[in-house]
Amino acid sequence: MNAGIGRVSSGRMAMKVTGRCHCGQITFEAEIDPAQVRVCHCTDCQTLTGTAFRTTVPSLPGSFVLRGGTPKIYIKTAESGNKRMHAFCPECGTPLYATAAGADPVSYGLRVGALDRRAELRPTRQGWCRSALPWSMDLTGIERFERQP
């Protein structure tokens, strides 16, 4: 098995991950199931990320630990009326996670781009595809560069 990957009592895969913002002020760790990486194409995620979609993975219940810094919190009200706390770095603005509004959240939707092991995580499903930007569903054929041209 890969380093940092095991099984939890439920039989699901568990992978320990660490994460941080771009400037390093905020650090955290959690356990995730790498088979649960998701892409969301909803218009809220497009706006909140400033791009075509958001990629997240839920932390396993009770495993999220904030190791350093204090994130800024933005509370978003969904179309359903549910409230979600979105955390980001107050210095560099990196989106970090979202969780249910209120005390003692159980699980955190970790932003894959903030995870140190993000290259090991591949999305397994997509949601809100009806809101997807048409070009975002197929990037084949677009000119590619190893670095900024």
Model-assigned labels for residue ranges:
Residues N2-P149:
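A short Gly-Trp-Pro
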